[in-house]
């Protein structure tokens, strides 16, 4: 009498081939076939130290800036048409949350304020009040020509010629309106600035 094969999952035949590792996850580099960043010297050094000792030593400041850049909570201060591009950054095409840049509704829970649009004289006290409600360290991204320097309405009697007259600005994103890619690049520059500045200087 013949034994049944592997049909319907009964009596599975033992596998004699080699056990394969799972395929690498993440965005693959077409030239190497490995995940993007796999050949980064920083990660190679960390991995070698972890495999050697089981832990690695880092400065507290490096740890704090790493955590801070990976969990920036931003609030919108959309004043005009630039706010539409700011909303687009959160949509699936760009998905700024993959960089740890998540939106919040309250200034008390936010690290970053994005000023997008024309700032008028009547709105300036509200902008300053919201900025003062944010906990330290706080950062501001000025998005678009109107927020940067008045833009199209620069000579209007009712427009503030740049929101840097009201709050300190960390990153300026130019354009009228700037594209979502430009704002995304501004976010990456802000993360780079936080890493460079550290906690004590701020």
From Swiss-Prot:
Binding locations of [4Fe-4S] cluster: 81-82, 146, 176
Top-rank taxon: Bacteria
One Gene Ontology CC term in the entry: respiratory chain complex I
Cofactor dependence: [4Fe-4S] cluster
Keyword ATP-binding among record annotations: no
Signal peptide boundaries: none
InterPro entries: NADH_UbQ_OxRdtase-like_20kDa (IPR006137), NADH_UQ_OxRdtase_20Kd_su (IPR006138)
GO molecular function: 4 iron, 4 sulfur cluster binding; iron ion binding; NADH dehydrogenase (ubiquinone) activity; NADH:ubiquinone reductase (non-electrogenic) activity; quinone binding
GO terms of biological process kind: aerobic respiration; electron transport coupled proton transport
UniProt KW keywords: 4Fe-4S, Cell inner membrane, Cell membrane, Iron, Iron-sulfur, Membrane, Metal-binding, NAD, Quinone, Translocase, Transport, Ubiquinone
Entry EC number(s): 7.1.1.-
Predominant cellular place of this UniProt entry's protein: membrane
Cofactor: how and how many bound: Binds 1 [4Fe-4S] cluster.
Sequence intervals crossing the membrane: none
Matches recorded under Pfam families: Oxidored_q6 (PF01058)
Main enzyme class: translocase
Membrane topology term: Peripheral membrane protein
Record's catalysed reaction(s): a quinone + NADH + 5 H(+)(in) = a quinol + NAD(+) + 4 H(+)(out)
Compartments, record wording: Cell inner membrane
HAMAP family, A to Z: NDH1_NuoB (MF_01356)
Function according to Swiss-Prot or TrEMBL: NDH-1 shuttles electrons from NADH, via FMN and iron-sulfur (Fe-S) centers, to quinones in the respiratory chain. The immediate electron acceptor for the enzyme in this species is believed to be ubiquinone. Couples the redox reaction to proton translocation (for every two electrons transferred, four hydrogen ions are translocated across the cytoplasmic membrane), and thus conserves the redox energy in a proton gradient.
Subunit structure, as described in the record: NDH-1 is composed of 14 different subunits. Subunits NuoB, C, D, E, F, and G constitute the peripheral sector of the complex.
Record-linked NCBIfam families: nuoB_fam, PRK06411.1
Family as reported in the entry's similarity comment: Belongs to the complex I 20 kDa subunit family.
Identification of the protein by name: NADH-quinone oxidoreductase subunit B
Organism: Bradyrhizobium diazoefficiens (strain JCM 10833 / BCRC 13528 / IAM 13628 / NBRC 14792 / USDA 110)
């Amino acid at each position: 009498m013949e034994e049944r094969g592997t049909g319907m999952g009964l009596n599975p035949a033992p596998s004699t081939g080699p056990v394969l590792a799972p395929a690498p996850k993440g965005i693959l580099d077409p030239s190497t076939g490995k995940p993007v960043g796999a050949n980064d010297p920083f990660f190679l050094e960390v991995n070698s130290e972890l495999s050697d000792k089981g832990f690695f030593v880092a400065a507290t400041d490096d740890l704090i800036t790493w955590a801070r850049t990976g969990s920036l909570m931003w609030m919108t201060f959309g004043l005009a048409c630039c706010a539409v591009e700011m909303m687009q950054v959160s949509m699936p095409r760009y998905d700024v949350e993959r960089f740890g840049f998540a939106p919040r509704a309250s200034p008390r829970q936010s690290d970053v304020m994005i000023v997008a649009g024309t700032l008028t004289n009547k709105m300036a006290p509200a902008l300053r009040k919201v900025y003062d409600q944010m906990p330290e360290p706080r950062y501001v991204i000025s998005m678009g020509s109107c927020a940067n320097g008045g833009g199209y309405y620069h000579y209007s009697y009712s427009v503030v010629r740049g929101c840097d007259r009201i709050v300190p600005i960390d990153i300026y994103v130019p354009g009228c309106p700037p594209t979502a890619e430009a704002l995304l690049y501004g976010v990456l520059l802000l993360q780079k600035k936080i890493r460079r500045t550290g906690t004590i200087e701020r």
